Amino acid sequence: MRGITSLIAAVLLASSITAVADEPAAGDFWTTPAIAGYGRMHPLPQAAYKPDPARTYRIVFSLTKAGQKPDEVSPSLDRVARTVNLYVASGVPLSHLKFVAVASGDATGIVLDDSHYKAAFGVSNPNLPLIAALRHAGVDVAVCGQAVAEHKFEYEWVDSSVTVALSALTTITTLEERGYHLMPL
């Protein structure tokens, strides 16, 4: 019996040492490997269901939430950054990510250029640096043209880096027909 107890203790000790060795250093707990400063993620090298780096991934994100305060980045947009970071951290090259993020509903205002955002909300648009970083990583950031009209924004107020789509409804269904997967955020 003493031999079994010693064996169990040794196995538990060895597994706890392995678990500690796999953890990143305290300063590296959160990382943003592709979209610097946004979409933080925690590396899990031994995790299940990791994406295959050889495949191409097509996702259309439906962005419907602005920040709780006008000076906060949209949590939906930040989740797009997290998704990019998760795929890149798993070894998938940016060239294998075909991502489109379309804003509508409450998220429509996140795509306004800085002067019009400031006029509407009283602060600079905190989403523009993230939109620029996403565009740089190959993500097409778009806005529902119908939502722009519903919010009584002018189309010229939309930041020049953002694609004005006919609608979120047609963008999503058109891209789904082309093999994209919908991720509502």
Q: Which residues fall in each region the model found?
A:
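Acidic helix-start/capping segments at beta-turn-to-alpha-helix junctions
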Residues: 93-111
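Histidine-anchored nucleotide/phosphate-binding helix
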Residues: 73-92
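Acidic/histidine-rich, surface-exposed loop or edge segments in extracytoplasmic proteins
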Residues: 52-70, 112-115
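A cross-taxonomic marker for long C-terminal extensions/tails that follow the last structured domain
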Residues: 22-25, 29-36, 40, 117-118, ...
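Solvent-exposed, acidic/flexible segments
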Residues: 66-76, 124, 165
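Structural recognition of the beta-strand scaffold that forms the well-ordered cores
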Residues: 58-62, 99-103, 140-143
